[in-house]
Amino acid sequence: MNSAAGFSHLDRRERVLKLGESFEKQPRCAFHTVRYDFKPASIDTSSEGYLEVGEGEQVTITLPNIEGSTPPVTVFKGSKKPYLKECILIINHDTGECRLEKLSSNITVKKTRVEGSSKIQYRKEQQQQQMWNSARTPNLVKHSPSEDKMSPASPIDDIERELKAEASLMDQMSSCDSSSDSKSSSSSSSEDSSSDSEDEDCKSSTSDTGNCVSGHPTMTQYRIPDIDASHNRFRDNSGLLMNTLRNDLQLSESGSDSDD
């Protein structure tokens, strides 16, 4: 132990320092130091790891993570360099033994990310998905303006057709009004004619007005009162004429009787 805290547990009495097996001519063991650039808290310190030395002094260290972590292991890769004069002091606090061992090599490793399992890779995939979705969105928007331009055409055509139909209907209604007014004036001017001709004129005007009304159902509710009023005038005028004729006949008969 090479820290100050380790020496604090030692008392002031003298101890025997032994040289370890690494100092033998044919050492049966070797000691190495490992330096990590970053050691995650998810590593399970109670489990054993694996160290593999490959070609070119390349070193791979695999340490298990806590159960349920993603990924299940953490992998470190690096290289080793030999030590020349460095040693390590090992103190056994239970027995009080102090042993000096020779360091063989210094291993420096860096944490690697497992492809497809790390959080960074997951975030990259999410970003790629968002970029792909954003790239698709403009293509969909480009087609919408043309459809929006074409869609308002049909309501405008419908409005134009409705306006034309209303204008045509107004023309027909005005023509019917003028014809009915002319017939009403002609019927009122013929009060001095005979009752038969008045009845025929009344029938013809009634039939013509009926045709006009039947041809334009929308106008019926507006023109029926005028037709009824003119028909009533025809009846009043006809009755007045008949009374006048009867009075004339009675006067002529009374005059002839007086002459006799």
Swiss-Prot record:
Name recorded for this polypeptide: ELL-associated factor 2
Region (Necessary for transactivation activity): 177-260
Tissue-specific expression: Expressed in heart, brain, placenta, lung, skeletal muscle, kidney, pancreas, spleen, prostate, testis, small intestine, colon, adrenal, bone marrow, lymph node, spinal gland, stomach, thyroid, trachea, thymus, liver and leukocytes.
Modification type Phosphoserine: residues: 146, 151, 154
Domain of life: Eukaryota
Cellular location(s): Nucleus speckle
UniProt record similarity statement: Belongs to the EAF family.
Biased composition (Low complexity): 174-192
Main location: nucleus
Induction section of the entry: By androgen.
Pfam families cross-referenced by the UniProt entry: EAF
Record's keyword terms, sorted: Activator, Apoptosis, Nucleus, Phosphoprotein, Transcription, Transcription regulation
Necessary for interaction with TCEA1 and transactivation activity as annotated region, ranges: 246-260
Native species: Homo sapiens (Human)
Single GO term (MF): transcription elongation factor activity
Biased composition regions of type Basic and acidic residues, renumbered to the chain: 116-126, 225-234
Location of region: Disordered: 116-154, 170-234
Subunit field text: Isoform 1 and isoform 2 interact with TCEA1. Component of the super elongation complex (SEC), at least composed of EAF1, EAF2, CDK9, MLLT3/AF9, AFF (AFF1 or AFF4), the P-TEFb complex and ELL (ELL, ELL2 or ELL3). Interacts with ELL and ELL2.
InterPro entries assigned to the protein according to its UniProt record, in alphabetical order: EAF_fam, Tscrpt_elong_fac_Eaf_N
GO CC terms in record: nuclear speck; nucleoplasm; super elongation complex; transcription elongation factor complex
